[in-house]
From Swiss-Prot:
Compartment annotation: Cytoplasm; Nucleus; Cytoplasm, Cytoskeleton, Spindle pole; Cytoplasm, Cytoskeleton
Protein name: Lys-63-specific deubiquitinase BRCC36
Classification via InterPro entries: BRCC36_C, JAMM/MPN+_dom, JAMM_MPN+_peptidase_M67A, MPN, MPN_BRCC36
Keyword Cell division in record: yes
Effect of mutating I212D: Abolishes tetramerization and metalloprotease activity
One GO biological process term: proteolysis
Cofactor(s) for this UniProt protein: Zn(2+)
Gene that this sequence comes from: BRCC3
A single cellular component GO annotation: BRISC complex
Chief location: cytoplasm
Keywords assigned by UniProt, alphabetized: Cell cycle, Cell division, Coiled coil, Cytoplasm, Cytoskeleton, Hydrolase, Metal-binding, Metalloprotease, Mitosis, Nucleus, Protease, Ubl conjugation pathway, Zinc
Keyword Coiled coil: yes
Coiled-coil positions: 227-249
Lineage: Eukaryota, Metazoa, Ecdysozoa, Arthropoda, Hexapoda
Stated family: Belongs to the peptidase M67A family. BRCC36 subfamily.
């Protein structure tokens, strides 16, 4: 591990896309995940992400269990072997639906706790579902911070372009709907066999509505996006095949 202090964070665009998709999956609760990458010369380079299942849905806070941290560490070890470079958990992210991008006192305390284990650990906050006062349009803000003597300190952040979406980010994107469905199933299980018939009907209706919501905002758009990418890749393949044939004719001619 590099002992230098954190000076800058580089976030790959495919990781940014996954985090943002997760943040936009619900405007009623905060969501969270863990960031994986490598750290060297004061720069944290984030190239993978793990979406965490919410153990308890709360509007104003999120929590990471020790089991989830262990799972993330195991995934980092797996990526170390797969990519043949050192990978580890570099930080966490969570959403602020309808509220400021600034870290709350709880966020700062949580961040300080993580930094006691790793001084270079960083936090990202995605402020979503906010409306501009003048434009009245949907705005998204991103804050990168650490805790310093009980106060939030902003860390320079650069979003680094990646020409393609990595396989690991694609897997994470497709896992999102599964995780959200599992959260709803866990909540439904807790309310199962309610003695009040009307309450039971209401709970089932809420569950059905939640599952439809997941399909509409996550699964269906993701399928449509992948279908468009497949069509585009086919066009590119056809174009490259034609170029290859022309070059072969020139060489043979």
């Amino acid at each position: 591990m590099d002992d230098s202090s954190l000076q800058k964070v580089e976030l790959q665009t495919d990781v940014y896309m996954v985090c943002l998709q997760h943040a936009l999956s619900t405007e009623n609760f905060e969501v969270m995940g863990l960031l994986i990458g490598n750290f060297a010369c004061g720069i944290a380079k984030i190239s993978a992400v793990i979406i965490l299942r919410r153990l308890d849905k709360k509007k104003d806070r999120v929590e990471i269990s020790s089991e989830q941290l262990l799972k993330a560490a195991a995934e980092a070890e797996r990526l170390t072997v797969e990519l043949n470079r050192p990978m580890r958990v570099l930080g966490w992210y969570h959403s602020h639906p309808h509220i400021t991008v600034c870290p709350s006192h709880v966020d700062v305390r949580t961040q300080a706790t993580y930094q006691t284990m790793d001084h270079s650990f960083v936090g990202l906050i995605f402020s979503v579902f906010s409306e501009g006062k003048e434009s009245k349009e949907h705005e998204i803000f991103l804050n990168c911070f650490q805790s310093d003597n009980g106060e939030a300190t902003e860390i320079p952040l650069e979003i680094v372009h990646t020409p393609d979406i990595s396989d690991r980010c694609l897997r994470t994107m497709t896992d999102l709907s599964k995780i959200l469905v599992q959260e709803e199933e866990d909540m439904a299980e807790a309310c199962k066999d309610h003695p009040d018939v009307l309450a039971s009907i209401h709970n089932n209706a809420v569950r059905t509505r939640a599952l439809i919501h997941i399909t509409d905002i996550i699964t269906k758009p993701l399928v449509q996006t992948f279908e468009k990418r497949i069509a585009l890749n086919k066009l590119r393949a056809t174009h490259l095949q034609r170029q290859l044939q022309e070059l072969q004719k020139m060489c043979n001619g």
